[in-house]
Amino acid sequence: MLDIKYLRNNRDEANQRLIDRNVEDGVLDKLLADDEKRRSLIRKAEQLKAKRNQVSDQIGAAKRAKDNSAAQKAISDMQTVAGQIKDLDKQLSAIEESVHTQAAHLPNLADPRVPVGPDDSYNVEQRKWQPTDLQGRPAAFSKTPTWLKAHFEIGEDLGILDFQRGVKVSGARFLYYVGAGARLERAVYNFMLDEHRREGYTELLTPYMVTNESMYATGQFPKFVDDAYEVGKNQSMTMIPTAEVALVNWRRDEVLDESELPLYITALSPAFRQEAGAAGKDTRGLIRLHQFNKVEMVKFTKPEDSYNELEKMTVDAENILQKLELPYHVIRLSTGDMGFGSAMTYDLEVWFPTQDKYREISSVSNDEDFQARRGHIQYRDSKTGKLRFVHTLNGSGLAVGRTVAAILENYQNEDGTITIPEVLRPYFGEDKISKENAR
């Protein structure tokens, strides 16, 4: 949620920054016009309530003076004022709901360092990384070797990814991990969680269903309600689209102790997504599923520390890819490509040799106080004694299924086997996946 005082006091600047976020010109004008109506109604209601108090005093005085005529007139005036207050309250309730709904649909404002542009073509690469020794690895080839297979093809050949039965049981974009596939997925997320614990994150096991209030606090609702899986009576609960929702809401409606900041937390969870806008995209494989595992990182920080913590969180995500020795690059997203609640986002994209391009595997964002305002998450500043909103940061560390897919593509061998990355071998128990040990 944006600070309405900032929007009022910096109208032109705020309007341009919203246009940069692909908000239509005029949306802010409508919001501020309704906000002024709301404030005007509040002033009128306060004046009438003050008048009601005066009339109440007049009634008391007239009764004490046994002036029945004056008392009856004052009572009549009271009834008139009460009716006016009731009418104003009804108008105020309607305009407040309108203002709140409009404000809830406005995205966060981008940090000035974010590249301005309407789409992903304006994203800017920050850095690129690949292992120093790529001997025998597909990524070392200037051209994709003819034997190289897409991750879903080699997964099916080895019998470790079963898409056909996933579709039979649950429909499109579902699968079964089988044998070594399930063990590889488990090895990957256990490795990720252990790395983040070493980096200072406290591990949580969160609920997988949350209330609509929780979805509102992190910015998924009301704008993206069609992308969610709503369940329960009257659709009062939602399957989490990311552990970010459960992690941020862990401290919703709380005043944190300043000594807790920065607070690092992490969790593994399934993510449930409708993928409403993904028709025809990535219809095969692990890239775009309705249910997938993801390790999430979240931070609560002081405002002055949040961008330094954003850089650290990005490095924490990069650390996973570097230890897995998977080629990747980091891009800073443009104003038109960032997520709804983000003020700045870095995407990590891992190399997929069969696609001859990088694919997103992590998105790391600073939401500044956008979520904290919606979720009322504050701390008391020890210097001023005043309450301040924390800044919240979130990042994938990483999307587990996409990591498995990247391993299958980058670590496959000409004989159809998969070499297990060295850091995963203590978790997986073997150094290769072949047809002989796939189950």
Curated annotation (Swiss-Prot):
Its EC number is 6.1.1.11. GO terms for cellular component: cytoplasm. Coiled coil: none annotated. It is found in: Cytoplasm. GO terms for biological process: selenocysteine biosynthetic process; seryl-tRNA aminoacylation. Keywords: Aminoacyl-tRNA synthetase, ATP-binding, Cytoplasm, Ligase, Nucleotide-binding, Protein biosynthesis. The keyword Ligase applies. It is an enzyme of class 6 (ligase). The keyword Metal-binding does not apply. Its main location: cytoplasm. InterPro entries: aa-tRNA-synt_IIb, aa-tRNA-synth_II, aa-tRNA-synth_II/BPL/LPL, Ser-tRNA-ligase_type_1, Ser-tRNA-synth_1_N, SerRS_1_N_sf, SerRS_core, tRNA-bd_arm. Pathway: Aminoacyl-tRNA biosynthesis; selenocysteinyl-tRNA(Sec) biosynthesis; L-seryl-tRNA(Sec) from L-serine and tRNA(Sec): step 1/1. It comes from the Bacteria. L-serine binds at residues 242-244, 296, 396. One of its GO terms (molecular function) is ATP binding. Catalyzes the attachment of serine to tRNA(Ser). Is also able to aminoacylate tRNA(Sec) with serine, to form the misacylated tRNA L-seryl-tRNA(Sec), which will be further converted into selenocysteinyl-tRNA(Sec). Homodimer. The tRNA molecule binds across the dimer. Belongs to the class-II aminoacyl-tRNA synthetase family. Type-1 seryl-tRNA synthetase subfamily. NCBIfam families: serS. Consists of two distinct domains, a catalytic core and a N-terminal extension that is involved in tRNA binding. This is Serine--tRNA ligase. It comes from Oenococcus oeni (strain ATCC BAA-331 / PSU-1). The lineage of its organism: Bacteria, Bacillati, Bacillota, Bacilli, Lactobacillales.
